[in-house]
Design a protein with these regions (language model features):
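Short, surface-exposed alpha-helical recognition segments that flank or form part
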Residues: 41, 180, 242-245
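Rossmann-like NAD(P)(H) cofactor-binding subdomain of soluble oxidoreductases
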Residues: 15-101
Length: 284
């Protein structure tokens, strides 16, 4: 079996280069041993993936490329005996049948060697460099993922503010061309990042990530509209991100923690509560 790949490649050009290729899928055999196993699954499914690997006695250093709302201790427990490192791909796409439409930026988020639980970290960084991928190492990868999820929850809930999320690509297009809606999204993100702060995260370590949401919301909305219009990489990844279950998982994690910690997040809560029955049946 093979995948037909359409890739907007952002490694060598800020505008991205359109590429096409075919990837032959070779399924892993039981008892196989690998240097690295990239684990990239939808929210809440890490445990099931680890179980599948373990039952088939497939071994190797895990690279976690997933959204999760767990603590590091919980991830340790879920992963069990597997050595692992936490990262995050600045990439995304949509798989329909055997057609993969995707976007790749020029870097990968990766945990520092000190915090990584693998013995072949240097081999991993060499592998990434050989693929012309830079590495960005945040203060703490777990906290960075929480922050990323909170920001995404702000964006998703704003895009779906009219209670419809069945056609996420169209919602993304509508949001990206509406400066007023984008300025409201910035206000929602300011609310959702308070949930991460309430979990004990020092936001001072993530100033670069949060800078776009510090400037006046009206101005930020205008800037974001212009950025989406001119930056095809960012625009494409927004429209390709279409896993509704994964989007709602992130929203639900942020919403429930906000309620648990009695935080005042009026716009975010209002956006979420409009989703109604779709929201009630979403995974967590």
């Amino acid at each position: 079996e093979s995948l037909n790949i359409s890739l907007l490649d952002g490694r060598y050009n800020k505008k991205g280069e359109e590429k096409a290729d075919q990837y032959k899928v070779s399924l892993a055999e039981p008892n196989a041993e690998y240097d690295f196993i990239i684990l990239s699954v939808a929210g809440g499914k890490i445990k099931d993936a680890i179980t599948t690997l373990s039952q088939n006695h497939i071994t190797g250093s895990l690279i976690l490329f997933c959204n999760f709302w767990n603590s590091r201790e919980e991830i340790d427990e879920i992963v069990g005996a597997y050595p692992y490192v936490i990262g995050f791909p600045t990439a995304g796409g949509k798989l329909v049948g055997n057609e993969l439409d995707c976007v790749l930026f020029d870097h990968i988020m990766l945990e520092s060697e000190e915090k990584a639980g693998i013995s072949n970290y240097k081999a991993l960084t060499a592998l990434l460099a050989s693929a012309d991928l830079k590495m960005e190492i945040p203060h703490d990868m777990v906290e960075w993922i929480w922050l990323h999820m909170a920001i995404n929850a702000g964006v998703t809930s704003s895009a779906a503010r009219e209670g419809k999320i069945e056609h996420p690509a169209q919602l993304a297009l509508n949001l990206m061309k509406d400066a007023h809606a984008l300025s409201t999204t910035v206000k929602v993100i300011r609310e959702t990042i308070q949930v991460v702060k309430a979990r004990g995260v020092d936001l001072g370590f993530y100033k670069n990530e949060l800078l776009p949401y510090r400037i006046p919301a009206t101005f930020a909305g205008i800037l974001m509209k212009r950025m989406f219009k001119t930056n095809e990489l960012t625009r494409r990844i927004m429209t390709l991100h279409s896993d509704v279950g994964d989007m709602l998982y992130g929203c639900k994690c942020v919403y429930e923690t906000g309620k648990l910690k009695h935080l005042e997040l009026p716009i975010f809560y209002s956006n979420i509560e409009v989703l109604g029955s779709i929201w009630e049946s979403s995974p967590l």
